[in-house]
Amino acid sequence: MTATEGIRPDVARTVRYPVYERFYTWQGEGVHLGAAAYFIRLYGCPQACPWCDSAGTWHHDSRPEGVTLMTAGALAAVVAQDSPDGAFVVITGGEPILFDLAPLVDALHALGRRVHIETSGIAELRGAIDWVTLSPKPFGTWPTPEVVARADEVKIIVHDVADLQAGLDTLEGLRPDAVIWLHPEWSKARERDMAVLNAITDAVKTNPRLRAGYQMHKLYRADELDAHSDKRLIPLGGNTDLGY
């Protein structure tokens, strides 16, 4: 099938998404850890996480000079060109559900690709997305009940011990089969902050539904191997000098 088969041609050609970066790598966290994946990172996010590792998608001191606008059809075409059949697609950000993803999801499905999303869940989730990874930001806008109910897995970023319970508090209505990951924020993992690491260990031992997680792609620096990735431009874990 072609990249635009299955969706209206006018939609495939006219809806445009602000693409910060796109690259082929593997999923570095969660249930699909280690699996080949093509990432589409969209520009724009209102959450302003203080430890953001993709601050180029929103922070005024790190955003690019220009952002490429691409149609659903054009994005599907580069996915088909730059990754083999069988690799799923991850739409991330920034905050991707600020945009109507239905045309893009349809175009990717027309290629036979499964579509995953990584989101903080603050808006309506549009499109027949196959896998929803929810990463709530309790200090910002909480996820909507509708997105919580659709989540297949949850990733709570633990920058300090209080973040752990605060993240869990946002999950009322979560499906019983949804997986809940506790990830140390990257600087805490890198510096072996034992208060954070031990809090995650204690939480998992207390509640077997929880799982301890890690961002393995950062150890491998796998994203940087694709020429289209901008990871080399933004320090891993953000830039504390700029306040993120």
PLM regions and their residue ranges:
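Short, solvent-exposed beta-strand edge segments and adjacent coil->beta transition regions
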Residues: 35-37, 151
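A short beta-strand-turn-helix
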Residues: 28-30
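Conserved AdoMet/S-adenosylmethionine-binding subsite of the radical SAM
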Residues: 85-86, 97-244
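Conserved Radical SAM active-site core
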Residues: 3-6, 12-13, 17-24, 36, ...
